[in-house]
Amino acid sequence: MKLINDILKKNYRLGKLLDIEEILTGYCNQSFTVWMEKNKFISKFLVRRYRLGTAEQEIKFEHALIYHLRKSEFKLTPDLIPQTNGNSYVKIQELDKGKPVVRFWAIFEFVEGENRYTWMDTDLSDAEITSAGQVLSRLHCAAQNFLIPPGSGRLQPKIMDFLPTFQLPYSKFTNRAGKTKCGRLFLKNMDNILAIIRKTIISKSDLIKMPFLPIHGDYHQGNLKYKKGRVVGVLDFDWAKIDFRLFDIALAVIYFSANWEKKRAGSLDRDKFETFIGSYNTACRLAESPGHLTSMEKKFFPSMLAAANLFVLHWAIVNFFTAVNPNDDEYLEYFDHNLKLMYWVENHQRLLADWIGL
């Protein structure tokens, strides 16, 4: 790709470009593996082209958090490769449908390890789930005391402020929803989705008692690299933000313990749930702060789990209705899964409280 070669030549001193391979597993950004030769030594890097519309302040936040994590001895996130001028990203003008647009690019070190799963794959080994829980705990511990640089930050609100905003885009989607299988399923369930959103409330007086810190925001098995049953890399911090720790944990539980198999689809697997939470808590006990799950976090875990699933469902809904020619069958699987899970979580609040140890 000529554009990548031009960016590398103009802004970096990484040597001669030998090969480029696009990574096709992402949904938002475009990523490439590149092989560079310098002084007869061949190195691999990851090149990211941020999705159109990404705000510069969000990239500044993401990169500052990555630097903080690595300085705090969390080395599982790949380091950023600075330009010759020291900046961590490249800002250029490209053409989109004939119109000039601003796009951002960044280069990361390449993390070796296995890409074993997508976010839909939950057949992880106990060792892999245990390691994932431990690593998320280490990430939260390292993320503390992060100072947000001026002019940086995630535009998306905190999860409990974000949920009430879902109604506005949903009302806009109804006019064209009946033309597709996804649209018809959305219309059939929209009132129930909005009703459950209204029920999923945690008061501010309770929220302020919970740990509030930088979170990954998209911690799933597809964003991790593995080696011999251990997590050896944590990728894709572009959804990171400052939010309640409990949301990050609940979101991870939705990903790591959800059942996708037909007979049990749309439910959570208790063994995987307890393995992940148990390993997270055990790892947290080794650090003074933020510590293991508090009694307040346990009390509202079922509610935050509902919020986390609604968050994932919302991503699928918005992506489907705003994409150009989305794959109806692909998104139907996402819609169906998270809708079933929405109802399962709603109907098993007492059971979930038992699982979390209330």
Language-model segments: what does each one mean?
Residues 3-12, 148, 169-217:
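An alpha-helical support segment within catalytic cores of ATP-dependent transferases
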Residues 27-37, 41-43, 80, 198-247:
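Active-site acidic catalytic loop and adjacent metal/ATP-binding pocket
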